[in-house]
């Protein structure tokens, strides 16, 4: 409101900053830097162990500005000014950048990028699990151009595998882990054109249960795509938009349940069932007909948080002595940005960071490689010379020198937040900019905000995490993970690599022992 804004202006002019007294002393910063340097020097001893477990946290749309803003929000939620806060991903020792473009797009979409960081090859926008030789919507270009994912490589190596997402389980990001489709929007056969069905292309929901039939953990939304058309939803009976969509009449959930009886598999559709079930060997949890709600709108009694899903997933997957691969997507960061709802997006990012922290408590860097990255960025940013501790959702402490009006610190390059009132820019000082659904100001009017094209950060820790350095193509990521775990096409080096996975030291010892024994004889 106007009073709050006036107070900000006054405090700014008084050169007020909510820093502590110790920050005025150079010793504070020197001590902090020396401590950081000491920690950095320990990284000279590289972790060359074999990665028994692999975890990929994917923040959909979580560009670097989103990471920074989420860091500030996390601190402010804990009563701090925010800038000095550390996200869990900030603690990872190795950081690199990934170039996100698709083969046919400078600014990418989530399907082509998912194919890159899961399957190891760049692809066209809108396609999943196929090479760039496949053309979007053209079914006849798919056959023979399928590519497999690291989830498949891990499964073939005897590891347990899982997918956890806050979107539909057949959405762009998770689908690239198991599906091959020339259109990311073919969620069920209801969304597919007749000629594609005739040519033998399969919908993505069907592929979830058929292509890799023994995925150990499946959690997210997308329930309606698994049931016959017009079948009433178990949670929202009688609500047409939540009813089943499948034209083929198949009940994929029932088929999965029948197939998993011998494995004692559990199908769950609400939080209570998830939390209180005994830890099964296999689980499929579909908690909403479509995407899960934003964390700020989530009913904590019925829908699990991303952190809760990750905890259950790891409890199940770690029972396999050969290890596991887990894909975790904070998928609704992207949705919040598209809608211009920065508060929704940033709270989603903070929740994903909580999930990263929970996974860290349940695993060890000795044998678990964890990577945190994004598929792409957004045209989201914040600025305006805000003072230290300024609420991340607040106003900049200055008026525009063009129209003499306030503006929000958070700004989108385009999107639905572009608003005119009587032909002039909206006076945001009279608007409740802190409500959850507030659409932050945008420079160009669009019904949906767009992706950004800049590089995204890749945070890594665990065995061979140092291989993620510098600037790389996005498709490099699964190759590093596979190399660390000795799966897929990266196996030969495992016989000679030093560390717990390397067998050369062991073989050398055996040869030496045999030589000594022969001499003694």
Regions found by a protein language model. Give the residues of each.
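Structural beta-sheet core signal
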Residues: 56-57, 163, 372
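Substrate-binding/charge-relay-adjacent region of secreted/lumenal peptidase catalytic domains
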Residues: 104, 108, 119-128
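Outer membrane beta-barrel
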Residues: 161-170
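A post-motif C-terminal structural segment
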Residues: 21-37, 47-52, 62-68, 72-115, ...
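Cleavable N-terminal signal peptides of Sec/SRP-targeted secreted and luminal proteins
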Residues: 1-15, 507-520
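C-terminal GPI-anchoring signal of eukaryotic secretory precursors
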Residues: 492-509
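His/Cys-centered metal/cofactor-coordination and adjacent catalytic loops
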Residues: 129-144
């Amino acid at each position: 409101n106007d009073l709050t804004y006036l107070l900000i202006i006054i405090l700014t002019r008084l050169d007020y900053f909510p820093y502590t007294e110790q920050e005025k002393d150079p010793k504070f910063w020197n001590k902090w830097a020396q401590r950081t340097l000491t920690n950095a020097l320990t990284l000279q001893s590289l972790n060359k162990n074999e990665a028994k477990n692999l975890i990929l946290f994917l923040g959909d749309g979580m560009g670097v500005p989103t990471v920074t803003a989420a860091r500030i929000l996390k601190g402010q939620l804990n009563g701090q000014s925010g800038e000095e806060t550390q996200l869990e991903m900030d603690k990872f020792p190795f950081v690199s950048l990934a170039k996100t473009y698709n083969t046919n797009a400078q600014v990418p979409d989530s399907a082509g990028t998912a194919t890159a960081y899961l399957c190891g090859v760049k692809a066209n926008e809108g396609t999943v699990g196929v090479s760039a030789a496949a053309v979007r919507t053209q079914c006849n270009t798919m056959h023979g151009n399928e590519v497999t994912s690291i989830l498949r490589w891990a499964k073939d190596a005897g590891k347990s595998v899982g997918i956890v997402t806050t979107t539909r389980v057949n959405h762009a990001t998770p689908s690239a882990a198991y599906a091959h489709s020339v259109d990311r929007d073919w969620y069920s056969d209801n969304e597919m054109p007749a000629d594609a069905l005739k040519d033998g292309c399969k919908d993505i929901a069907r592929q979830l249960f058929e292509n890799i039939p023994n995925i150990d953990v499946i959690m997210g939304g997308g329930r309606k795509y698994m049931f016959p058309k017009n079948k009433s939803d178990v949670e929202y009976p009688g609500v047409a938009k939540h009813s089943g969509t499948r034209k083929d009449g198949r009940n994929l959930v029932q088929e999965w349940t029948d197939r998993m009886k011998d494995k004692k598999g559990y199908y769950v559709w609400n939080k209570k069932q998830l939390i209180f079930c005994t830890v099964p060997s296999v689980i499929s949890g579909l908690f909403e007909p479509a995407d899960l709600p934003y964390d700020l709108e989530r009913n904590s009694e019925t829908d699990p948080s991303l952190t809760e899903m990750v905890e259950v997933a790891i409890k199940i997957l770690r029972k396999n002595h050969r290890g596991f691969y887990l894909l975790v997507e904070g998928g609704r960061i992207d949705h919040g940005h598209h809608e211009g709802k920065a508060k929704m997006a940033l709270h989603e990012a903070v929740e994903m960071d909580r999930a990263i922290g929970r996974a860290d408590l349940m695993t060890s860097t000795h044998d678990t490689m964890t990577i945190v990255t994004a598929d792409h960025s957004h045209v989201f940013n914040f600025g305006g010379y805000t003072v230290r501790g300024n609420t991340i959702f607040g106003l900049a402490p200055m008026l525009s020198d063009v129209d003499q009006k306030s503006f929000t610190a958070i700004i989108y390059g385009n999107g639905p937040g572009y608003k005119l009132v009587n032909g002039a820019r909206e006076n945001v000082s009279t608007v409740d900019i802190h409500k959850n659904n507030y659409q932050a100001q945008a420079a160009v009017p669009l019904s949906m905000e767009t992706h950004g094209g800049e590089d995204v950060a890749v945070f890594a820790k665990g065995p061979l995490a140092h291989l993620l350095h510098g600037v790389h193509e996005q498709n490099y990521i699964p190759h590093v993970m596979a190399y660390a775990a000795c799966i897929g096409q990266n196996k030969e080096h495992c016989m000679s690599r030093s560390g717990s996975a390397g067998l050369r030291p062991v073989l050398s010892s055996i040869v030496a022992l045999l030589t000594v024994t022969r001499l003694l004889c």
